[in-house]
Amino acid sequence: DLPTVPDGENRQLDVKFIGDLLVQWDPDVAIIENVQAMPSIPGADGQRRSMGAASSFRFGMACGMIRATVVAYSVPLVMCHPRSWKNHFGLKGSDKKQDAALCKKLYPSSEPFITLVKHHGRADAGLMAGWYADKQGML
């Protein structure tokens, strides 16, 4: 879940709020998934779907805004490719439900925060944190 503010008929990232959170929480590190625009893939109806040019631009802009905010607030940044954390947890080829189930199993205190399918990003964030902690010998 990312905080947003109105921007005409759309919404955009609230980087001021993200910066305020970084000051309040004073994290040792920020782990950001190194994502890319969605390629053309088959949809449930068999039709191919992909991210359009405008969507790709907005997605890339939001990714850049998050990274810039983290760097501007002097928080060490770790970029994590989805393949890295998914392979670490044996989730190659998994879907969002499997990722969420594993996060809740490994980190039971996360369960109240991952109750809906749309909360898969929270599960991903938990697993990325676990990937980093394992990599650093923290777990």
Could you say what each language-model-derived stretch is?
Residues 1-139:
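Phosphate- and other anionic-substrate recognition elements at nucleic-acid/protein interfaces
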